């Protein structure tokens, strides 16, 4: 993937960048792997706003992704590499020899015609998926399960990767993209390689309208709201917030306030906390 820059022909174009989509081989998704995706606008089943800054955006269809990678022993070939509007990573359509088709996250370096395999006997090759116990120490992986058979939950965004550091009993030590070292059950599966589209983080949106196309609404400062909308709101003109520390919209301390539970169940699996960024 390369970044495409634009001439400043307008204020919206000045500084704007996009992907050149050189890795994308088709713009026609596999119809059998599409599902309807209804917009919620950040509302729950009572119609109440639960997630701010969501709404509008271009109509999308959901691509059904195989995060479980449980088609053991059956080889498949990459048919296409496609854009997915629902995630930062690209996806690859796999045609298996038994006729089934599935989408997977497209790892870096995968191309049309590449053969992939899942299962304990699969080779250590980019795109293959194996239980962590079968993956050598030092291997770069992505799409990691937290529970065997549940499907990959960790390391799925564009450009992310994790590394297998060691094996202790029924657990495998994995260093995540954040720097956190975590113990994961050795029966959990992971895919080999780094997630592709690694320059996604370098894209400059350029204008507010492009965020609206994605369904992202504006983020308004609390200090310009009314007192009934935000703890920082109210006052005459540019008034100070009038509190000891900044507050979230729900009255909780923010900007440095720790939000993780003090007795989180997953603490026993974390060997080293993530690096401060």
Curated annotation (Swiss-Prot):
SUPFAM superfamilies: Nucleic acid-binding proteins, Translation proteins SH3-like domain
Residue ranges, compositional bias (Basic residues): 258-277
GO cellular component terms given for this protein: large ribosomal subunit
BP-aspect Gene Ontology terms: cytoplasmic translation
Keywords of this entry: Ribonucleoprotein, Ribosomal protein, RNA-binding, rRNA-binding
Pfam families: Ribosomal_L2, Ribosomal_L2_C
Keyword Transmembrane: no
MF GO annotations: rRNA binding; structural constituent of ribosome; transferase activity
Region (Disordered) location: 36-58, 219-277
rRNA-binding recorded as keyword: yes
Transmembrane segments: none
Top-level taxon in the UniProt lineage: Bacteria
Record-stated family: Belongs to the universal ribosomal protein uL2 family.
HAMAP family (alphabetical): Ribosomal_uL2_B (MF_01320_B)
Subunit (UniProt): Part of the 50S ribosomal subunit. Forms a bridge to the 30S subunit in the 70S ribosome.
Protein's job: One of the primary rRNA binding proteins. Required for association of the 30S and 50S subunits to form the 70S ribosome, for tRNA binding and peptide bond formation. It has been suggested to have peptidyltransferase activity; this is somewhat controversial. Makes several contacts with the 16S rRNA in the 70S ribosome.
Protein name (record): Large ribosomal subunit protein uL2
Organism: Bacillus velezensis (strain DSM 23117 / BGSC 10A6 / LMG 26770 / FZB42)
């Amino acid at each position: 993937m390369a970044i495409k820059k634009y001439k400043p022909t307008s204020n919206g174009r000045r500084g704007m960048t996009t992907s050149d989509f050189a890795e994308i081989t088709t713009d026609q998704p596999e119809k059998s792997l599409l599902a309807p995706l209804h917009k919620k606008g950040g509302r729950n089943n009572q119609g109440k706003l639960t997630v701010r800054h969501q709404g509008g955006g271009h109509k999308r269809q959901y691509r059904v992704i195989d995060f479980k990678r449980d088609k053991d022993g059956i080889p498949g070939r990459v048919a296409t590499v496609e854009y997915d509007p629902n995630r930062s990573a690209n996806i690859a359509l796999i045609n298996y020899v038994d006729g089934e088709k599935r989408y997977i996250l497209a790892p870096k370096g995968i191309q049309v015609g590449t053969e992939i395999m899942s299962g304990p006997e699969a080779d250590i090759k980019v795109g293959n998926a194996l239980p962590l116990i079968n993956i050598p120490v030092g291997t770069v992986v992505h799409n990691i399960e937290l529970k065997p058979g549940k499907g990959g939950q960790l390391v799925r965004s564009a450009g992310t990767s994790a590394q297998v550091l060691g094996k202790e009993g029924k657990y495998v030590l994995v260093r995540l993209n954040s720097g956190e070292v975590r113990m994961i059950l050795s029966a959990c599966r992971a895919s080999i390689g780094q997630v592709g589209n690694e320059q996604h983080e370098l894209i400059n949106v350029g204008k507010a309208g492009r965020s609206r196309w994605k369904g992202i609404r504006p983020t308004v400062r609390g200090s310009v709201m009314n007192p009934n909308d935000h703890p920082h709101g109210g006052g005459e003109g540019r008034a100070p917030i009038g509190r000891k520390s900044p507050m979230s919209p729900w009255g909780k301390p923010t900007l440095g306030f720790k939000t993780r539970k003090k007795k989180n169940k997953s603490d026993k699996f974390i060997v080293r906390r993530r690096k401060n960024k």
